Amino acid sequence: MELNTITPGQGAKHAKRRVGRGIGSGLGKTAGRGHKGQKSRSGGYHKVGFEGGQMPMQRRLPKRGFKSHLLKFNAEVTLTALEQLGLAEVDLLTLKQSGLVGQIAKNVKIINTGSLSLAVKLTGISATAGAKTIIEAAGGSIA
């Protein structure tokens, strides 16, 4: 078998249905759209979520909660990611350069996911209580 001899399986490819090309085709004249009405017109059909004039569902239900714009400035880094980084001293700049956090991140928190056997000194980075105990047990520190 060669790459230039491979063909699609039988019935895998379908010819595009051509509509509006004469009565002999079976889909001529109205082209499967029926007679008259909004759906038969070009560009004519309701927008998504329109319910025929009745109050739509997304307006009947109450608003709930909000999305904080501050979330994009806060980032989380796992202990496993910190281990894979393999650095003795870690700060916000090194995390940005390594690509672990985005460039717009202002605050970073180390979370207790995974394990850490490397002694890491963190500067300007916070950690959860569980992550803090693991970092200190491995010989690291948080400043």
UniProtKB/Swiss-Prot annotation:
One of its GO terms (cellular component) is cytosolic large ribosomal subunit. Keywords: Ribonucleoprotein, Ribosomal protein, RNA-binding, rRNA-binding. Pfam families: Ribosomal_L27A. SUPFAM superfamilies: Ribosomal proteins L15p and L18e. GO terms for biological process: translation. The keyword Cell cycle does not apply. Transmembrane segments: none annotated. The keyword Ribosomal protein applies. Residues 1-59 are annotated as: Disordered. Coiled coil: none annotated. Residues 21-31 have a biased composition (Gly residues). Signal peptide: none annotated. GO terms for molecular function: rRNA binding; structural constituent of ribosome. Binds to the 23S rRNA. Belongs to the universal ribosomal protein uL15 family. NCBIfam families: rplO_bact (TIGR01071). Part of the 50S ribosomal subunit. This is Large ribosomal subunit protein uL15. It comes from Polaromonas naphthalenivorans (strain CJ2). The lineage of its organism: Bacteria, Pseudomonadati, Pseudomonadota, Betaproteobacteria, Burkholderiales.
